[in-house]
Protein backbone atom coordinates (compact mmCIF):
# COMPACT_ATOMS: atom_id res chain seq x y z
CA UNK A 1 0.00 0.00 0.00
CA UNK A 2 2.87 2.39 0.70
CA UNK A 3 4.34 1.74 -2.75
CA UNK A 4 0.92 2.42 -4.29
CA UNK A 5 0.68 5.65 -2.30
CA UNK A 6 4.03 6.80 -3.65
CA UNK A 7 2.99 5.92 -7.21
CA UNK A 8 -0.20 7.94 -6.83
CA UNK A 9 1.77 10.97 -5.67
CA UNK A 10 4.09 10.62 -8.66
CA UNK A 11 1.06 10.50 -10.99
CA UNK A 12 -0.41 13.63 -9.43
CA UNK A 13 2.82 15.52 -10.00
CA UNK A 14 3.13 14.24 -13.56
CA UNK A 15 -0.50 14.72 -14.60
CA UNK A 16 -1.45 17.75 -12.44
CA UNK A 17 -5.16 16.84 -12.25
CA UNK A 18 -7.57 19.77 -12.12
CA UNK A 19 -9.60 19.61 -8.91
CA UNK A 20 -12.76 21.72 -8.97
CA UNK A 21 -13.63 22.85 -5.45
CA UNK A 22 -16.96 24.25 -4.36
CA UNK A 23 -15.68 24.90 -0.88
CA UNK A 24 -16.06 27.35 1.96
CA UNK A 25 -14.73 30.88 2.35
CA UNK A 26 -12.74 29.96 5.46
CA UNK A 27 -10.38 27.54 3.70
CA UNK A 28 -10.53 28.48 0.04
CA UNK A 29 -7.07 30.03 -0.26
CA UNK A 30 -5.36 27.49 1.98
CA UNK A 31 -6.91 24.57 0.12
CA UNK A 32 -5.81 25.95 -3.23
CA UNK A 33 -2.25 26.31 -1.96
CA UNK A 34 -2.27 22.80 -0.48
CA UNK A 35 -3.32 21.32 -3.82
CA UNK A 36 -0.64 23.29 -5.63
CA UNK A 37 2.01 22.12 -3.16
CA UNK A 38 0.83 18.53 -3.58
CA UNK A 39 1.22 18.84 -7.34
CA UNK A 40 -2.41 19.16 -8.43
CA UNK A 41 -4.17 22.12 -10.05
CA UNK A 42 -6.99 23.77 -8.07
CA UNK A 43 -9.93 25.80 -9.26
CA UNK A 44 -12.44 27.41 -6.90
CA UNK A 45 -15.72 28.13 -8.71
CA UNK A 46 -19.19 28.21 -7.20
CA UNK A 47 -21.31 30.47 -9.44
CA UNK A 48 -24.33 28.66 -10.87
CA UNK A 49 -23.57 30.36 -14.19
CA UNK A 50 -20.31 28.44 -14.66
CA UNK A 51 -20.03 25.37 -12.45
CA UNK A 52 -21.22 22.96 -15.14
CA UNK A 53 -18.74 24.36 -17.64
CA UNK A 54 -15.95 24.16 -15.08
CA UNK A 55 -16.76 20.52 -14.32
CA UNK A 56 -16.29 19.83 -18.04
CA UNK A 57 -12.62 20.76 -17.56
CA UNK A 58 -12.05 19.06 -14.22
CA UNK A 59 -10.62 15.69 -13.26
CA UNK A 60 -12.36 15.60 -9.86
CA UNK A 61 -14.97 17.58 -7.93
CA UNK A 62 -15.07 18.51 -4.24
CA UNK A 63 -18.35 19.55 -2.61
CA UNK A 64 -17.71 21.18 0.78
CA UNK A 65 -20.72 22.54 2.69
CA UNK A 66 -18.78 24.65 5.18
CA UNK A 67 -20.35 28.03 4.34
CA UNK A 68 -23.70 27.14 2.85
CA UNK A 69 -26.21 29.43 1.21
CA UNK A 70 -29.11 28.63 -1.10
CA UNK A 71 -27.29 29.69 -4.32
CA UNK A 72 -24.29 27.57 -3.34
CA UNK A 73 -26.55 24.56 -2.80
CA UNK A 74 -27.94 25.05 -6.31
CA UNK A 75 -24.38 25.19 -7.66
CA UNK A 76 -23.45 22.02 -5.79
CA UNK A 77 -26.32 20.11 -7.35
CA UNK A 78 -25.56 21.38 -10.84
CA UNK A 79 -21.88 20.52 -10.49
CA UNK A 80 -22.55 17.09 -8.99
CA UNK A 81 -24.93 16.18 -11.79
CA UNK A 82 -22.38 17.28 -14.40
CA UNK A 83 -19.61 15.32 -12.67
CA UNK A 84 -21.67 12.13 -12.57
CA UNK A 85 -22.49 12.53 -16.26
CA UNK A 86 -18.76 12.79 -16.98
CA UNK A 87 -17.88 9.93 -14.62
CA UNK A 88 -15.32 11.95 -12.67
CA UNK A 89 -14.91 11.35 -8.93
CA UNK A 90 -16.92 13.44 -6.48
CA UNK A 91 -15.78 13.95 -2.87
CA UNK A 92 -18.36 15.26 -0.40
CA UNK A 93 -17.21 17.03 2.77
CA UNK A 94 -20.32 17.39 5.00
CA UNK A 95 -18.90 20.12 7.24
CA UNK A 96 -21.08 20.56 10.32
CA UNK A 97 -23.63 17.89 9.39
CA UNK A 98 -25.68 17.31 12.51
CA UNK A 99 -25.20 20.88 13.74
CA UNK A 100 -28.14 22.33 11.77
CA UNK A 101 -30.96 20.88 9.71
CA UNK A 102 -29.84 22.90 6.67
CA UNK A 103 -26.41 21.28 6.64
CA UNK A 104 -27.65 17.79 7.41
CA UNK A 105 -30.44 17.89 4.83
CA UNK A 106 -28.15 19.27 2.13
CA UNK A 107 -25.56 16.55 2.70
CA UNK A 108 -28.21 13.83 2.69
CA UNK A 109 -29.77 15.13 -0.52
CA UNK A 110 -26.39 15.08 -2.22
CA UNK A 111 -25.83 11.51 -1.06
CA UNK A 112 -29.32 10.41 -2.06
CA UNK A 113 -29.40 11.99 -5.51
CA UNK A 114 -25.84 11.56 -6.78
CA UNK A 115 -23.25 8.81 -6.91
CA UNK A 116 -20.80 10.34 -4.47
CA UNK A 117 -17.39 8.66 -4.75
CA UNK A 118 -16.00 9.50 -1.31
CA UNK A 119 -17.70 10.92 1.78
CA UNK A 120 -15.02 12.43 4.03
CA UNK A 121 -15.94 13.80 7.44
CA UNK A 122 -15.22 13.74 11.14
CA UNK A 123 -16.84 11.20 13.45
CA UNK A 124 -19.74 13.43 14.49
CA UNK A 125 -20.62 14.28 10.88
CA UNK A 126 -20.57 10.65 9.78
CA UNK A 127 -22.69 9.57 12.75
CA UNK A 128 -25.23 12.32 12.06
CA UNK A 129 -25.59 11.30 8.41
CA UNK A 130 -26.17 7.71 9.51
CA UNK A 131 -29.03 8.91 11.69
CA UNK A 132 -27.25 8.29 14.99
CA UNK A 133 -27.27 10.61 17.97
CA UNK A 134 -24.11 12.67 17.78
CA UNK A 135 -22.79 15.84 19.34
CA UNK A 136 -20.99 18.60 17.49
CA UNK A 137 -19.32 21.76 18.72
CA UNK A 138 -20.03 24.03 15.76
CA UNK A 139 -18.30 22.14 12.96
CA UNK A 140 -15.93 20.24 15.27
CA UNK A 141 -16.36 16.63 16.33
CA UNK A 142 -16.62 15.54 19.94
CA UNK A 143 -16.62 11.84 19.02
CA UNK A 144 -13.65 9.56 18.39
CA UNK A 145 -13.16 7.75 15.10
CA UNK A 146 -13.96 4.32 16.57
CA UNK A 147 -17.38 5.52 17.75
CA UNK A 148 -18.35 6.19 14.12
CA UNK A 149 -16.86 3.08 12.54
CA UNK A 150 -20.14 1.15 12.25
CA UNK A 151 -21.88 4.26 10.89
CA UNK A 152 -19.21 4.59 8.20
CA UNK A 153 -19.63 0.96 7.13
CA UNK A 154 -23.41 1.39 7.01
CA UNK A 155 -23.20 4.53 4.88
CA UNK A 156 -20.65 2.91 2.56
CA UNK A 157 -22.96 -0.04 1.99
CA UNK A 158 -26.08 2.08 1.51
CA UNK A 159 -24.54 4.57 -0.91
CA UNK A 160 -21.98 2.26 -2.57
CA UNK A 161 -19.33 4.84 -1.73
CA UNK A 162 -16.10 5.09 0.20
CA UNK A 163 -16.54 6.71 3.61
CA UNK A 164 -13.52 8.22 5.34
CA UNK A 165 -13.53 9.35 8.97
CA UNK A 166 -10.61 11.57 9.87
CA UNK A 167 -9.39 12.16 13.40
CA UNK A 168 -6.51 11.07 15.62
CA UNK A 169 -6.61 7.92 13.49
CA UNK A 170 -8.35 7.75 10.12
CA UNK A 171 -10.77 4.98 9.14
CA UNK A 172 -11.64 4.43 5.48
CA UNK A 173 -14.15 1.87 4.22
CA UNK A 174 -16.15 0.83 1.19
CA UNK A 175 -18.22 -1.59 3.29
CA UNK A 176 -16.52 -4.97 2.78
CA UNK A 177 -13.00 -3.56 2.91
CA UNK A 178 -11.43 -1.02 5.20
CA UNK A 179 -8.16 0.67 6.06
CA UNK A 180 -6.73 2.64 8.95
CA UNK A 181 -4.20 5.42 8.70
CA UNK A 182 -2.25 6.26 11.84
CA UNK A 183 -0.34 9.22 10.42
CA UNK A 184 -0.88 12.79 11.56
CA UNK A 185 -0.14 15.17 14.43
CA UNK A 186 -2.28 16.88 17.11
CA UNK A 187 -1.40 20.30 15.67
CA UNK A 188 -3.53 19.43 12.65
CA UNK A 189 -6.57 19.80 14.88
CA UNK A 190 -5.51 23.20 16.23
CA UNK A 191 -5.71 25.11 12.94
CA UNK A 192 -8.63 25.59 10.61
CA UNK A 193 -8.77 23.90 7.25
CA UNK A 194 -6.89 20.63 7.61
CA UNK A 195 -10.05 18.55 7.30
CA UNK A 196 -11.18 20.47 4.25
CA UNK A 197 -7.71 20.12 2.75
CA UNK A 198 -7.95 16.37 3.38
CA UNK A 199 -11.08 16.16 1.23
CA UNK A 200 -9.44 18.02 -1.64
CA UNK A 201 -6.28 15.93 -1.43
CA UNK A 202 -8.41 12.78 -1.51
CA UNK A 203 -10.06 14.14 -4.67
CA UNK A 204 -6.65 14.64 -6.30
CA UNK A 205 -5.71 11.04 -5.50
CA UNK A 206 -9.07 9.81 -6.82
CA UNK A 207 -8.30 11.59 -10.09
CA UNK A 208 -5.25 9.37 -10.67
CA UNK A 209 -6.34 6.02 -9.19
CA UNK A 210 -9.42 3.99 -10.20
CA UNK A 211 -10.06 2.52 -6.73
CA UNK A 212 -11.40 5.24 -4.41
CA UNK A 213 -10.62 3.16 -1.30
CA UNK A 214 -6.95 3.05 -2.27
CA UNK A 215 -7.00 6.69 -3.35
CA UNK A 216 -8.59 7.97 -0.15
CA UNK A 217 -6.26 5.91 2.02
CA UNK A 218 -3.20 7.11 0.11
CA UNK A 219 -4.26 10.75 0.20
CA UNK A 220 -4.94 10.76 3.93
CA UNK A 221 -1.63 9.04 4.61
CA UNK A 222 0.30 11.64 2.61
CA UNK A 223 -1.42 14.50 4.42
CA UNK A 224 -0.80 12.85 7.78
CA UNK A 225 2.88 12.32 6.99
CA UNK A 226 3.12 15.97 5.94
CA UNK A 227 1.63 16.92 9.30
CA UNK A 228 4.27 14.90 11.12
CA UNK A 229 7.07 16.45 9.08
CA UNK A 230 5.71 19.95 9.64
CA UNK A 231 5.61 19.40 13.41
CA UNK A 232 9.16 18.06 13.75
CA UNK A 233 10.56 21.15 15.46
CA UNK A 234 7.54 21.76 17.71
CA UNK A 235 6.25 24.91 15.99
CA UNK A 236 3.29 26.93 17.19
CA UNK A 237 -0.01 26.49 15.34
CA UNK A 238 0.51 29.52 13.09
CA UNK A 239 3.94 28.41 11.94
CA UNK A 240 2.71 24.83 11.58
CA UNK A 241 -0.02 25.98 9.19
CA UNK A 242 2.64 27.26 6.79
CA UNK A 243 5.04 24.37 7.36
CA UNK A 244 2.32 21.91 6.37
CA UNK A 245 2.28 23.42 2.88
CA UNK A 246 6.06 23.19 2.70
CA UNK A 247 5.92 19.55 3.78
CA UNK A 248 3.41 18.69 1.06
CA UNK A 249 5.63 20.38 -1.50
CA UNK A 250 8.74 18.56 -0.28
CA UNK A 251 7.10 15.12 0.09
CA UNK A 252 9.25 12.33 -1.30
CA UNK A 253 8.84 8.60 -1.77
CA UNK A 254 11.24 7.93 1.09
CA UNK A 255 9.02 9.92 3.48
CA UNK A 256 6.09 7.67 2.57
CA UNK A 257 8.17 4.50 2.87
CA UNK A 258 9.68 5.52 6.22
CA UNK A 259 6.68 7.10 7.91
CA UNK A 260 3.56 5.62 6.33
CA UNK A 261 1.38 3.75 8.84
CA UNK A 262 -1.46 2.07 6.94
CA UNK A 263 -3.29 -1.06 8.04
CA UNK A 264 -5.67 -2.75 5.59
CA UNK A 265 -8.49 -5.15 6.46
CA UNK A 266 -10.35 -6.92 3.68
CA UNK A 267 -13.30 -8.00 5.81
CA UNK A 268 -15.19 -6.32 8.64
Curated annotation (Swiss-Prot):
Annotated EC: 2.7.1.50
Cofactor: Mg(2+)
InterPro entries for this protein: Hyethyz_kinase (IPR000417), Ribokinase-like (IPR029056)
Protein keywords: ATP-binding, Kinase, Magnesium, Metal-binding, Nucleotide-binding, Thiamine biosynthesis, Transferase
Record bears the keyword Magnesium: yes
GO molecular function: ATP binding; hydroxyethylthiazole kinase activity; magnesium ion binding
Any GO BP: thiamine biosynthetic process
Binding residues for ATP: 120, 166
CDD domains in the record: THZ_kinase
Similarity-based family: Belongs to the Thz kinase family.
Function summary: Catalyzes the phosphorylation of the hydroxyl group of 4-methyl-5-beta-hydroxyethylthiazole (THZ).
UniProt-listed HAMAP family: Thz_kinase
Protein name per the record: Hydroxyethylthiazole kinase
Organism for this UniProt entry: Syntrophobacter fumaroxidans (strain DSM 10017 / MPOB)
Classification lineage: Bacteria, Pseudomonadati, Thermodesulfobacteriota, Syntrophobacteria, Syntrophobacterales
Amino acid sequence: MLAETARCLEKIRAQRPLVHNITNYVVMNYTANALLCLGASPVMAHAVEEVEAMVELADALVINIGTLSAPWVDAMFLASRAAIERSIPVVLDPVGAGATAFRTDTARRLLDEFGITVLRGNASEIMALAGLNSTTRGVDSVHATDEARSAAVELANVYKAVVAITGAEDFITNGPKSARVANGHPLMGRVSGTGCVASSIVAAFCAVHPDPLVAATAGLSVLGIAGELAARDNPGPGTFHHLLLDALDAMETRNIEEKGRIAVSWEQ
